[in-house]
């Protein structure tokens, strides 16, 4: 089963266990967030939303918050000794899709438990 979700003005095709980077959303690392704007639910017979599928959502675990690559905006006006250089980095949230929910169900899968490293490996 797949879903097409919309977040941050962009659309993503997702299946369970996908890892994707989207624009920053609220949520602490390790928590489950629900993305409610589902445009398409796909299975044997796909369900198209008008504009969204009623009662459908996608549950995802927040893996990380980070910054994207630097984007440089450079403008030069030739023969005028004039230029402008600016750069920025987007705030990014890394998500793992845990499950696709239909009919207003609540997420049944919680966040994954991280395995603790043994003391010998942590010292190295």
UniProtKB/Swiss-Prot annotation:
Regions annotated as coiled coil: none
Chain positions covered by the region annotation Disordered: 105-124
Assigned GO CC terms: cytoplasm; ribonucleoprotein complex; ribosome
Alphabetical keyword list: Ribonucleoprotein, Ribosomal protein, RNA-binding, rRNA-binding
Pfam families attached to this UniProt entry: Ribosomal_L21p
Any one GO molecular-function label of the UniProt entry: rRNA binding
Taxonomic superkingdom: Bacteria
Segments crossing the lipid bilayer: none
A biological process from GO: translation
Family assignment from sequence similarity: Belongs to the bacterial ribosomal protein bL21 family.
Function: This protein binds to 23S rRNA in the presence of protein L20.
Binding partners and assembly: Part of the 50S ribosomal subunit. Contacts protein L20.
NCBIfam families tied to this protein: L21
Protein name as it appears in the record: Large ribosomal subunit protein bL21
Organism from which the protein derives: Rhodopseudomonas palustris (strain BisA53)
Organism phylogeny: Bacteria, Pseudomonadati, Pseudomonadota, Alphaproteobacteria, Hyphomicrobiales
